[in-house]
Swiss-Prot record:
It comes from Homo sapiens (Human). It catalyses: L-seryl-[protein] + ATP = O-phospho-L-seryl-[protein] + ADP + H(+); L-threonyl-[protein] + ATP = O-phospho-L-threonyl-[protein] + ADP + H(+). This is Serine/threonine-protein kinase D1. Residues 377-402 are annotated as: Disordered. It is found in: Cytoplasm; Cell membrane; Golgi apparatus, trans-Golgi network. A zinc finger (Phorbol-ester/DAG-type) spans 146-196, 270-320. One of its GO terms (biological process) is positive regulation of sarcomere organization. Keywords: Angiogenesis, Apoptosis, ATP-binding, Cell membrane, Cytoplasm, Differentiation, Disease variant, Ectodermal dysplasia, Golgi apparatus, Immunity, Inflammatory response, Innate immunity, Kinase, Magnesium, Membrane, Metal-binding, Neurogenesis, Nucleotide-binding, Phosphoprotein, Repeat, Serine/threonine-protein kinase, Transferase, Zinc, Zinc-finger. It is linked to Congenital heart defects and ectodermal dysplasia: An autosomal dominant syndrome characterized by atrial and/or ventricular septal congenital heart defects and variable features of ectodermal dysplasia, including sparse hair, dry skin, thin skin, fragile nails, premature loss of primary teeth, and small widely spaced teeth. Patients manifest developmental disabilities ranging from motor delay and delayed speech to global developmental retardation. Belongs to the protein kinase superfamily. CAMK Ser/Thr protein kinase family. PKD subfamily.
């Protein structure tokens, strides 16, 4: 008989279900199976002892080899016993079992059959060794189950199961436990309790709690028997596709074991919940669902930082352990930069603001293995991180901003943009054109933007594209002059600017009836062509928003409509918008207060436009009047800094407002910046353009009332783009000394007089400009909702913490302070803001002049400033661009020059 292997997983003598129960019974002293049966002697190899290990009713032959000193070690036997438990009965193993087991040798000749094994020399060839759990094992020992954490790359959004916050980043966002499958931040790895509940990978029983250096059995020494191979077919690394592949497959555990023992002895009390505002996407730690909203999304325990919904709070167990610290470091999830509200706060706003953030504030792409290595000592045990190197301040301090990060404030439909068009219809079809009378057969595929003629139904190669925006008309058969003699006529015609497509083939005298499948694959027949005509006609229709009322009839989109041309003030009746513009339903540019904005294209010129579609039946009369107010205001505004309204179409059910299409908005520019905020020189460039557009509005007694980065559009993707104001749904006609009281705008950017339902005037826009400057330079909102704005303004440390305001000039802070004035009479006007030293910058003036030269229109700067800046450049030794020199400017201080300058200055301040 050959010698047994060094260690082999046991082959249970009972079925699997009974074996697990037997293992649990085996770990109690005196529960052995009784006298050992006769064991056949096994021939031992040189330098080894062959014997059997018995755990419950499972018995395994093992081989004990000599160590490097030539002796036998009892530690080897303990190691074998723990390995068998980990492989065969992982649900029965626990951390530190190595120190909690006793070994007994069966001696049939003795009155006491079980003899305690005190040394490896007590084990003889062919003995049966019983593994028994010591009475020193406590209930807490069974509860301590450390996690096996590995760096993981997630392909879908995931949340930390300790703090509830989202795992940020593109790759290696966090750690995943291979035992229970839970996910954690790298920063939370040192705080999570050792409570792994999984059995995917349990190889921790052979670790000593006393620090004894144990010998781990290498994977090369393990051999599995044939019946057990199906259990071990999939390695732990194969169970998690996103796990980082490591050569040594080293795992990491959570907080120190002795701390878990201390915490288990503590008295558990009910949680103390307070309403909380979260700055990052967070899930409820009870139901694992997202805490929705922008502010006051849920409740958080003041002591242990447990997060949950308000509806889930009564169901949360009373298991709060309070604030747990070790070496001054808080082990409960940190407050980070969140804002704690009072208990009495209104929780209904979370339902009104249930839009999820569209933009992420950071992307963590770090090597977690290096971070873990820094926190390990030589023995491989986890050490507490250096508090000086913590990446997040856990308490509110003047050094770090505690304000809400800048985000897109959603008030209506969530901003979405689908990248790929959905196929509306596909199939074989034949056609010929006005330039080529040869009838061709292709596989047609219709989506929301074009008709693509593919070579076949499986490949990606195509013959031609027919953009829907280029289709001028879709009509039945009009002419048969191009039909060859004896050929069947076509079914319908697609007319574009350059060519006419004659589609389909109407078989007049079919030779024999064809089965349906051959008709579909051949692309001929009046029925097949009719289906294509209806599908294309439907694709050319204006977009019908979800939830809108839909009438009956195939020509619903050709209801009597009125087209109002803003440029020439012409009104045309019975004009269908689909004959002039093509609307792309899958290109959602955004949403305003009264409708969704889609991308579109002018059919004849190919010019890109933005089309706002409003379903009138969804809105009450008051909101419909606000829409008309927006159109009426835009009709009277013609300024390069204001978005251009081309025309408006109106049907009994819907209104289509056609505007120029721009590149993006200012908020997208801020959030996509490297630091999540803009440099000062770019902010000056953008703010100056906003102020010039506001000056034009205020000159016409128009107050925007909803000024925010989302409503500042960029004309291009250039680093220094032209900007235009849009979304005048809340705009009001307010005289110089007039006041209004109706509630308008977005709360995050509104002045306090509006929030308090007091009268407001045109200075309302100037408060919004101050907020825009603040969020552009810092990437956060300036105020918290739970504190009085006046008190926050007085607290300079709160308003301007060193991070990031230490990098920002004092002139910028001074301008913000003069704009964010609670008293309206102290708030800066447009011209006073433009004259502030922060905006009177030579480089900003040069950038604006370059923009004006590029556009071909001077509307931001004034000629009266040319001489002043040219003189400034000479005094400072700066090079003045030659192409910006104004030839009409005179360098002599003649009375005529002074009179001209005074006249120009009078024009500039005439609106004050």
């Amino acid at each position: 008989m050959s010698a047994p292997p060094v260690l082999r997983p046991p082959s249970p003598l009972l079925p699997v279900a009974a074996a697990a129960a037997a293992a649990a019974a085996a770990l109690v002293p005196g529960s052995g199976p009784g006298p050992a049966p006769f064991l056949a002697p096994v021939a031992a190899p040189v330098g080894g002892i062959s014997f059997h290990l018995q755990i419950g009713l499972s018995r395994e032959p093992v081989l004990l080899l000599q160590d490097s000193s030539g002796d036998y070690s009892l530690a080897h036997v303990r190691e074998m016993a723990c390995s068998i438990v980990d492989q065969k009965f992982p649900e029965c193993g626990f951390y530190g079992m190595y120190d909690k087991i006793l070994l007994f040798r069966h001696d049939p000749t003795s009155e006491n059959i079980l003899q305690l094994v005190k040394a490896a020399s007590d084990i003889q060839e062919g003995d049966l060794i019983e593994v028994v759990l010591s009475a020193s094992a406590t209930f807490e020992d069974f509860q301590i189950r450390p996690h096996a954490l590995f760096v993981h790359s997630y392909r879908a959004p995931a949340f930390c199961d300790h703090c509830g916050e989202m795992l940020w980043g593109l790759v290696r966002q966090g750690l995943k436990c291979e035992g229970c499958g839970l996910n954690y931040h790298k920063r939370c790895a040192f705080k999570i309790p050792n409570n792994c509940s999984g059995v995917r990978r349990r190889r921790l029983s052979n670790v000593s709690l006393t620090g004894v250096s144990t010998i781990r059995t290498s994977s090369a020494e393990l051999s599995t028997s044939a019946p057990d191979e199906p259990l071990l077919q999939k390695s732990p690394s194969e169970s998690f596709i996103g796990r980082e592949k490591r050569s040594n497959s080293q795992s990491y555990i959570g907080r120190p074991i002795h701390l878990d023992k201390i915490l288990m002895s503590k008295v558990k009390v009910p949680h103390t919940f307070v309403i909380h505002s979260y700055t990052r996407p967070t899930v409820c730690q009870y139901c694992k669902k997202l805490l929705k909203g922008l502010f006051r999304q849920g409740l958080q325990c003041k002591d242990c930082r447990f997060n949950c919904h308000k509806r889930c709070a009564p169901k949360v167990p009373n298991n709060c352990l309070g604030e747990v610290t070790i070496n001054g470091d808080l082990l409960s999830p940190g407050a980070e930069s969140d804002v704690v509200m009072e208990e009495g706060s209104d929780d209904n706003d979370s339902e009104r603001n249930s839009g999820l953030m569209d933009d992420m504030e950071e992307a963590m792409v770090q090597d977690a293995e290096m971070a873990m290595a820094e926190c390990q000592n030589d023995s491989g045990e986890m050490q507490d991180p250096d508090p000086d190197h913590e990446d997040a301040n856990r308490t509110i301090s003047p050094s770090t901003s505690n304000n809400i990060p800048l985000m897109r404030v959603v008030q209506s439909v969530k901003h979405t943009k689908r990248k790929s068009s959905t196929v509306m219809k596909e199939g074989w079809m034949v056609h010929y054109t006005s330039k080529d009378t040869l009838r061709k057969r292709h596989y047609w595929r219709l989506d929301s933007k074009c008709i693509t003629l593919f070579q076949n139904d499986t490949g990606s190669r195509y013959y031609k594209e027919i953009p829907l925006s280029e289709i001028l008309s879709l009509e039945p058969v009009k002419t048969s002059a191009l039909i060859p003699n004896g050929a069947n006529p076509h079914c319908f015609e697609i007319t574009t600017a350059n060519v006419v497509y004659y589609v389909g083939e109407n078989v007049v005298n079919p030779s024999s009836p064809s089965p349906n499948n051959s008709v579909l694959t051949s692309g001929v027949g009046a029925d097949v062509a009719r289906m294509w005509e209806i599908a294309i006609q439907h694709a050319l229709m204006p977009v019908i928003p979800k939830g809108s009322s839909v009438g009956t009839g195939t020509n619903l989109h050709r209801d009597i409509s009125v087209s109002i041309s803003v440029s020439n003030c012409q009104i045309q009746e019975n004009v269908d918008i689909s004959t002039v513009y093509q609307i792309f339903p899958d290109e959602v540019l955004g949403s305003g207060q009264f409708g969704i904005v889609y991308g579109g294209k002018h059919r004849k010129t190919g010019r890109d436009v933005a089309i706002k579609i409003i379903d009138k039946l969804r809105f009450p009369t008051k909101q419909e009047s606000q829409l008309r107010n927006e159109v009426a205001i835009l009709q009277n505004l013609h300024h390069p800094g204001v978005v251009n309204l081309e025309c408006m179409f109106e049907t009994p059910e819907r209104v289509f407002v056609v505007m120029e299409k721009l590149h993006g908005d200012m908020l997208e520019m801020i959030l996509s910046s490297e630091k999540g905020r803009l440099p000062e020189h770019i902010t000056k460039f953008l703010i100056t353009q906003i102020l010039v557009a506001l000056r034009h509005l205020h000159f016409k007694n128009i107050v925007h009332c909803d000024l925010k980065p989302e409503n500042v559009l960029l004309a291009s993707a250039d680093p220094f783009p032209q900007v235009k104001l849009c979304d005048f749904g809340f705009a009001r006609i307010i005289g110089e000394k007039s006041f209004r009281r109706s509630v308008v705008g977005t709360p995050a950017y509104l002045a306090p007089e509006v929030l308090r339902n007091k009268g407001y005037n045109r200075s309302l826009d100037m408060w919004s400009v101050g907020v825009i400057i603040y969020v552009s330079l810092s990437g956060t909102f300036p105020f918290n909702e739970d504190e009085d704005i006046h008190d926050q303004i007085q607290n300079a440390a709160f308003m301007y913490p060193p991070n990031p305001w230490k990098e920002i000039s004092h002139e910028a802070i001074d301008l913000i302070n003069n704009l964010l004035q609670v008293k309206m009479r102290k708030r800066y006007s447009v011209d006073k803001t433009l004259s502030h030293p922060w905006l009177q910058d030579y480089q900003t003036w040069l950038d604006l002049r370059e923009l004006e030269c590029k556009i071909g229109e001077r509307y931001i700067t004034h000629e009266s400033d040319d001489l002043r800046w040219e003189k400034y450049a000479g005094e400072q030794g700066l090079q003045y661009p030659t192409h910006l020199i104004n030839p009409s400017a005179s360098h002599s201080d003649t009375p005529e020059t002074e009179e001209t300058e005074m006249k120009a200055l009078g024009e500039r301040v005439s609106i004050l």
